[in-house]
Amino acid sequence: MDVKMTIAIRGDLKISCGKAAAQAGHAAVECVLAAMGDAKWRKWLDQWLEEGQKKIVLTADDAAHLYQLHERAKSLGLPTAVVIDAGLTELPPGTPTAICVGPAPDELVDKVTGSLKLYK
């Protein structure tokens, strides 16, 4: 069983590469912290850490799409987190920017984000 993490950044936001990278980082940290507190998720986290921490950054359409992905991940029992921007640089406070799913088995993560395109 392979495990991975996917991060989806909103494609409708016009943000800098640095901002997108920061939001992806926030998303990854939030999911790792969540996974540390759950026995099943912790197994996936430990495997993910041992195997190179595979991450894939994808594009979500908009805020509504982020929340749809988040609900799907929760319904499958996967670690997930939505990042809400603090509004200190490029975006208004409270703007949802990204979602993370995993680390979890590839086939489960793909049920949530498998149809998304790579972030550019």
UniProtKB/Swiss-Prot annotation:
Cell compartment(s), UniProt: Cytoplasm
Pfam families according to UniProt: PTH2
EC code: 3.1.1.29
Catalysed reactions, as listed in the record: an N-acyl-L-alpha-aminoacyl-tRNA + H2O = an N-acyl-L-amino acid + a tRNA + H(+)
Keywords assigned by UniProt, alphabetized: Cytoplasm, Hydrolase
Primary subcellular site in the record, as a coarse category: cytoplasm
One MF annotation (Gene Ontology) recorded for this entry: peptidyl-tRNA hydrolase activity
GO cellular component: cytosol
GO biological process per UniProt: translation
Classification via InterPro entries: Pep_tRNA_hydro_II_dom_sf, Pept_tRNA_hydro_arch, PTH2
Record-linked HAMAP family: Pept_tRNA_hydro_arch
The family this protein is said to belong to: Belongs to the PTH2 family.
Function: The natural substrate for this enzyme may be peptidyl-tRNAs which drop off the ribosome during protein synthesis.
Name of the protein in its database record: Peptidyl-tRNA hydrolase
Organism, as annotated: Pyrobaculum aerophilum (strain ATCC 51768 / DSM 7523 / JCM 9630 / CIP 104966 / NBRC 100827 / IM2)
Lineage: Archaea, Thermoproteota, Thermoprotei, Thermoproteales, Thermoproteaceae
